[in-house]
């Protein structure tokens, strides 16, 4: 991935704690170029899918105390991703604001809906409870999906709803969720020529 050039819808956030070190750069008007290394291979796979299908240029570099478990690194990366997304959105002028997507993956079907509203909220439904203790790819507990999506929604100040309609394979469920969010975000942040230079809200602010 080439170095990002300054743009009007670019976010860059670094965050370091005693548990992790995270850098996220993203360009909302990219072409899906991704450069991901979180030291958690399945999470790399999911963030690659997210950046690709959102058509964001996305760079993520994370390291942390994965010798304990992946929780801190995964959640902290989601926090910084949300902050970078919020930064890239700026004043939210001229965006479509709302987006949703249905994503099938073999036996799985997932749906995501996004409102770039400035109001942080996340609702997740339909995930099979028996998978909450299931680990994918060696060190990615399935239950971390909830932490990731809630952290993204809270720190980007978006309203995010994610539904699993049906599915049996935890990998397929997680991947369909990430791709549905990606496509919903892509639609929501897309410029709307009819709202050019205008905040898409009756309040005049988001």
Curated annotation (Swiss-Prot):
An example Gene Ontology CC term for this record: cytoplasm
EC number: 4.2.1.19
Pfam families, per database record: IGPD
PROSITE patterns: IGP_DEHYDRATASE_1, IGP_DEHYDRATASE_2
Compartment(s) where it occurs, according to its Swiss-Prot or TrEMBL record: Cytoplasm
Entry-linked NCBIfam families: PRK00951.1-6 (NF002110), PRK00951.2-1 (NF002111), PRK00951.2-4 (NF002114)
Protein name listed in UniProt: Imidazoleglycerol-phosphate dehydratase
